[in-house]
């Protein structure tokens, strides 16, 4: 039992270390040596758990989907208007992309390596499915306006999430003629402003 627990901790440390490296330099530039050093394990211990870098990357993707998917599932069980729950889901995902390196690395890897169309490892598919199901509920409970197509509505919400996350690290103030040293909106603040723009078209005033 102790040996299994130690093995589980080592595997978890490797996934977190790999996430940090993938997040910082991407898949191609990441090396197993750097990952093992960051995890403070030997190269042999890394090879015991993951035969190749691709296996480690897939484990990061799976962990990212599991962690984020669990939070979305909890929110989906809440009572209340479906549209409001979908908005809360969007805020949760933006927050995770800001604060959780595993989730951030998992989504980056989806763009950098060949990833199967499987929600257990493809976070964007995982999240889009949750948003779609929640907005279908919103259509049923009346919090989504009649006539709104659920599929593009879910895709729009997903685009707000990914767009907000990608722009957060960009000095967008420069595009608006402001100083790069002016105060920057947080990702959630930016998401709130964008949802305020689209809410009337999706859910009404």
Regions from the PLM with identified roles:
Residues 47-50, 54:
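A short His-aromatic
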Residues 91-144, 152:
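Short secondary-structure transition hinges
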Residues 17-21, 96, 160:
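Short amphipathic alpha-helical elements of helix-turn-helix/winged-helix folds
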Residues 1-25, 29-41, 54-59, 63, ...:
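Basic, helix-initiating cap at the start of DNA-binding domains
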Residues 59, 73-103, 150-157:
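Hydrophobic alpha-helical connector segments
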Residues 1-9, 79, 170-181:
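N-terminal intrinsically disordered/low-complexity leader segments
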Residues 125-141, 159-205:
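C-terminal peripheral helix-coil segments that are non-catalytic and often amphipathic
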